Swiss-Prot record:
Known EC number: 1.1.1.17
Sites where the protein binds NAD(+): A5, I6, Q7, F8, G9, G10, G11, N12, I13, G14, R15, G16
The protein, known as: Mannitol-1-phosphate 5-dehydrogenase
Organism of derivation: Neosartorya fischeri (strain ATCC 1020 / DSM 3700 / CBS 544.65 / FGSC A1164 / JCM 1740 / NRRL 181 / WB 181) (Aspergillus fischerianus)
GN (gene name): mpdA
Quaternary organization: Monomer.
NCBIfam families reported in the protein's UniProt record: PRK02318.2-5
Length: 388
């Protein structure tokens, strides 16, 4: 029997990043989703195209050998598929992990194969697979928990690839940047060895890769989006073509670089080269990457361990400068009532109805005693004053 991977999430990242590389590694991919439109399209279309965009032009790959199941109406089928799968991946968004966990728990529990299934969450969040595992354990009988490692092994991952807004009539086809990084920890697989997926860079310690990615790519991308939004820019490339915004982004990434190089075995030169690569990628006009797409979900992006508060809090604890990140936080707070983004409306409501003190605690999760708390509270108060 051939290799089989279960991919939760049939969206752009699921189809245009995860499934692309699973397909290239020789896996049959079974997409799981609850959106009828996506499942119906995948069922009725035997192939779709992934176009990798770079300055050299576009390279198109054809993806085949997949199936699709709606977990909302066919849960038993999903359980059976997980029962005989080699790999389970997901790209659903960190907030959705708790909703996919029950069916994955049932699927893992039903396994009888001698080799455990590899579970890898592909989300923009630190320790997403650990989070998913926690939810899965909540839906597993207590007397089965001690033997779960015989049925499943869980590995955290760091993913990095820009997927811009897609053309309106793209269907299942995905336009995506050529550059990618998919780094996964290999130690959880032990004597079984990790799955054979050539696109993955397997490492013993993932934390430096996750923090470097989140605090460089995500921090830089979101900083560009929020400053761009406030200054009326439509595209990320347009925002970075503005010399002032470009300088601000570099200043922010200089501060996060200070954290990354002091915490991890990454040299200043390595980090500087990484920053240059990231800014060049984001400046690519061929991606047609929209400022509002990158800025959406500001509540999540302002939360405690995310791209702004995460690095700024650690810098503050170490007595290192974080003022440039305060600017990013301010611009994120100004991303209010953006059409199609519920979190931006909720953000506006919080800032309108709460005091600066209450809003700071709710939005950032910072303790009042934290050295970052007061500076952020001042920024919150400033934005509230300007909004009146």
């Amino acid at each position: 029997m051939g290799k089989k991977a279960i991919q939760f999430g049939g969206g752009n990242i699921g189809r245009g990043f995860v499934a692309e590389f699973l397909h290239e590694a020789g896996y049959e991919v079974v997409f799981i989703d609850v959106v009828d439109k996506i499942i119906d399209a995948l069922k009725s279309t035997p192939s779709y195209e992934v176009s990798e965009v770079s300055e050299e032009g576009e390279k198109t790959k054809t993806i085949t050998n997949y199936r699709a199941i709606n977990s909302k109406t066919n849960e038993e089928d999903v359980v059976k598929e997980i029962g005989t799968a080699d790999v389970v991946t997901c790209a659903v968004g960190p907030n959705v992990l708790k909703f996919i966990a029950p069916v994955i728990a049932k699927g893992i529990d039903a396994r009888t194969a001698s080799k455990p299934v590899a579970v890898i969450a592909c989300e923009n969040a630190i320790g997403a697979t650990d989070t998913l595992r926690g939810f899965i354990e909540q839906h597993t009988d207590k007397d089965r928990l001690s033997s779960m490692s015989e049925r499943a092994r869980f590995a955290n991952s760091a993913i990095d690839r820009i997927v811009p807004n897609q053309p309106p009539n793209a269907g299942l086809n995905v336009r995506i940047e050529k550059f990618y990084e998919w780094t996964v920890e290999q130690t959880p697989f032990g004597e079984f060895g990790h799955p054979d997926i050539p696109a993955i860079h397997w490492v013993d310690d993932l934390k430096p890769y996750i923090e470097r990615k989140l605090f460089t790519v995500n921090t830089g991308h979101a900083t560009t989006a929020y400053y761009g939004h406030v200054r009326g820019k439509k595209m990320i490339a347009d925002a970075l073509a503005d010399a002032e915004i470009r300088k601000i982004v570099h200043n922010v990434l200089e501060q996060t670089a200070m954290l990354i190089t002091t915490k991890h075995e990454i040299t200043e030169q390595e980090q500087n080269e990484y920053v240059d690569t990231i800014v060049k990628r984001m400046s690519n006009p061929f991606l047609e990457d929209n400022v509002e797409r990158v800025g959406r979900a500001p509540l999540r992006k302002l939360s405690r361990n995310e791209r702004f508060i995460g690095p700024a809090s650690q810098l503050a604890e170490k007595g290192l400068p974080f003022d440039a990140l305060l600017g990013s936080i301010e611009m994120a707070l100004r991303f209010q009532n953006v059409p199609g983004d519920e979190e931006s409306a909720e953000l506006a409501k919080i800032l309108k109805e709460m005091s600066a003190d209450e809003a700071t605690g709710k939005l950032t999760g910072l303790e009042k005693s934290h050295p970052l708390y007061k500076p952020v509270q001042n920024v919150v108060a400033k934005v509230q004053k300007d909004s009146k």
